[in-house]
């Protein structure tokens, strides 16, 4: 009996503009079918309530997903004041109310407290694991959930407008692991009220931005031709913030075989200014990624080899 075909070997990234109402996994599964792709993953979960940039990795690009997930995110968030929800967004049940509506002056004065490195407790309806089980599974089973706080980084938090007393619009620039639902909840409490996320849109995720993201309908229209579209970005697109080191064919072959390359050989033909011990680099041959590597004791040692 013949083996079932597993799909095309597609390698690269698509920046998808995820619509409201579907999960990140829904997007992955839809693209796998539409593009007949053998291997697909995403670079940072967006809740069903949220829209915006969802980076999708194909094939060998999945080896670079962690670098996108560790990257900076930019959001536009609308907070509704006066109602706390069990999910910390508009899809949950109302669990508390308040008549307090903070004004722009009070909100602006509070923002510094939530900027920089802060402690944050994830929402109980989240994928955080508690003794091997997802927190949202425990919450849905009406089991008590107590999550530990964690350090997260809010690089910038700006009040854009207060269109009505019931809503505040914010622009947030965050590091990895920050929950916007928790930020809305905690900001409201600090302002003497309660609140939840009414709308959330991700404007950027690592190097991928809303300006270059494409819709699922556009991918559907391309179908199996999507891998040949200019929208499919190279694997290196996810690594814009990582220094690049050019290799010769012989050096590329060594790294591909799991062997280190001497920095002295590289330095003899190309400047390596600014590279530090322990730093991660992208090793390139003719502009194409060969491996992600680390500088250790005068050598470039492969971390993740790309097989194209």
UniProtKB/Swiss-Prot annotation:
InterPro entries: PsdUridine_synth_cat_dom_sf, PsdUridine_synth_N, tRNA_psdUridine_synth_TruB, TruB_C. It catalyses: uridine(55) in tRNA = pseudouridine(55) in tRNA. Coiled coil: none annotated. It comes from the Bacteria. The active site is at 47 (nucleophile). This is tRNA pseudouridine synthase B. GO terms for molecular function: RNA binding; tRNA pseudouridine(55) synthase activity. Gene3D superfamilies: Pseudouridine synthase (3.30.2350.10). NCBIfam families: TruB.
